[in-house]
Amino acid sequence: MSRSTPLKKVRNIGIAAHIDAGKTTTSERILFFTGMSHKIGEVHDGAATMDWMEQEKERGITITSAATTCFWKDHQINLIDTPGHVDFTIEVERSMRVLDGAVAVFCSVGGVQPQSETVWRQANKYGVPRIVFVNKMDRIGANFYNVEDQIRNRLKANPVPLQIPIGAEDNFKGVIDLVTMKALVWEDDTKPTDYVEKEIPAELKEKAEEYRTKMIEAVSETSDELMEKYLGGEELSLEEIKTGIKAGCLSLSIVPMLCGTAFKNKGVQPLLDAVVAYLPAPDEVPNIKGEYEDGTEVSVKSTDDGEFAGLAFKIMTDPFVGQLTFVRVYRGCLESGSYAYNSTKDKKERIGRLLKMHSNKREEIKVLYAGEIGAVVGLKDTLTGDTLASEKDKVILERMDFPDPVISVAVEPKTKADQEKMSIALNKLAQEDPSFRVSTDEESGQTIISGMGELHLEIIVDRMLREFKVEAEVGQPQVAYRETIRKTVEQEYKYAKQSGGRGQYGHVFLRLEPLEPGSGYEFVNDIKGGVIPKEYIPAVDKGVQEALQNGVLAGYPVEDVKVTVYDGSYHEVDSSEMAFKLAASMGFKEGARKAGAVILEPMMKVEVETPEDYMGDVIGDLNKRRGQVNSMDERGGNKIITAFCPLAEMFGYSTDLRSQTQGRATYSMEFDHYDEVPKNVADEIIKKRNG
């Protein structure tokens, strides 16, 4: 059975946006116009087909990226829905890995919001070409040109409008297509219709000419021959313009801009045309990098020929089929009923059924070809970020980085009988979401869950109740503090035990040095002349790593330190790995006490948007929370305050902010970096921990 859509005509795209820019509505309309869904779901009444988990329907925010397949002008579009809430950046990061292109949706009134910046950064990190859709052009205060400026100034990108709006707010009628120089008008507001091509209205002719010239200038810079033609005063043909836009889009040197209102069904068809015309096919993006077990690098080309290689990028539990693993195929093809090799875990997996998801319906298929995305039923050992490959070519594709959680809470089931159900539920949820961790507190025996923010953990507890019927009590949130050192010290430690028969002997000299924030842990072996035999060096490293788990001040993990073992001695008979491990571990602890140990806390980047009247109160309150105000800005008549605040001071902030501003301010917060805790606060923390 050969593929129904040639590789050239496949598009893997994500729709990325800030909350409320209208991303889900845009996805819905895409599914509608491509003929997949018959009744349009509105987010307002909680019926959108992409938002298929119950909590999303209630909260009206999109949490999990469902991958949906639809067709437009004989192209297959695999649409990956990405969440817009900052606690779910991990989901966005994960979908960015498997996208070839993205549609960034901005609200014509709100413009570039804090979350848009995060998503934009992630798209830059993975080199994802994107086009911009300025949505909600029918809203009061809609301004296409403002958004263009913000993309240039705040996101430091090069936006190139391919359309300009005809009217705005209530008078938004359609768009002027600058490529064909025609007006596209939607005449019926009430139902989804095709547009009508008309001549450009006289009052917009001059503006259209001005923007077309800007577009042609940008296009001519994408290649020498277009530049020559343009400078020589020749007209560029329609084909040349389109080729130039695509080249600029793929090289990330330009960001094509379109506009419309998805809710009123205007602008969606031209957006789909642009996806097909300007976003890349799987073989038009740089090959994905991979490596073999021995570390040799290899580049994996998107083609049906060649051994199978794919990436598992999402795991979900489906009430009817059980566990679904979403896979993007990069090379070769994956057949149902066959075997694949999980090269990350070194395990063979049987491929059960293969499904293509159409937002809430599923279609069973026999084969997934290169460049396609689908779900596999029944994988046992495969987790998010694992590579599936062929046994003949055990390539490991680049891994995804997942951030460490910054907030923890203790959970216990309401009834003792639910204890086992709760641990099954939590383990399932942790498999789906690598930024969520489950552990047990050794002293109290409590179950601790950790994640990227309060909302993240709320939703986990909520899902336990809905999907696994486990009601849980949640403790006070705990902050993930860390410890580090500020001074370089040298420390000798001798571990010697002589108690009849064979003794224990390990002797080390360690140098502890502070590293730049975010560097983690580095171990250096600087032993000369075999004063400690080679085979004991890994034990020294291991001993230090064990000591790093519990710092000397309050028992928090120690990071950003470099440890060098540079001298020592051993005993022919009594030395053992155990002895060197203990010597290193105790030596590190003793050294750390002299090295100016400090406690670090997670600092959050907080952005508050508030009416000007409340600005003083908001800033005063942030200062009370030990926040440092970083910048002030204006957006749409409101003040935007950006500050760095300790996570420990931000619990319950949403309630306080609401009461301070009568519910008129909004805020977003994401983890930014770790910073030293002031001495008085550190003393409190130490007292509490060592109580």
Curated annotation (Swiss-Prot):
GO terms for biological process: ribosome disassembly. It is found in: Cytoplasm. The keyword S-adenosyl-L-methionine does not apply. Residues 8-283 form the tr-type G domain. GTP binds at residues 17-24, 81-85, 135-138. GO terms for molecular function: GTP binding; GTPase activity; translation elongation factor activity. SUPFAM superfamilies: EF-G C-terminal domain-like, P-loop containing nucleoside triphosphate hydrolases, Ribosomal protein S5 domain 2-like, Translation proteins. GO terms for cellular component: cytoplasm. Keywords: Cytoplasm, Elongation factor, GTP-binding, Nucleotide-binding, Protein biosynthesis. Catalyzes the GTP-dependent ribosomal translocation step during translation elongation. During this step, the ribosome changes from the pre-translocational (PRE) to the post-translocational (POST) state as the newly formed A-site-bound peptidyl-tRNA and P-site-bound deacylated tRNA move to the P and E sites, respectively. Catalyzes the coordinated movement of the two tRNA molecules, the mRNA and conformational changes in the ribosome. PANTHER family: RIBOSOME-RELEASING FACTOR 2, MITOCHONDRIAL, TRANSLATION ELONGATION FACTOR G-RELATED. NCBIfam families: EF-G (TIGR00484), PRK12740.1-3 (NF009379), PRK12740.1-5 (NF009381), small_GTP (TIGR00231). Belongs to the TRAFAC class translation factor GTPase superfamily. Classic translation factor GTPase family. EF-G/EF-2 subfamily. This is Elongation factor G. The gene is fusA.
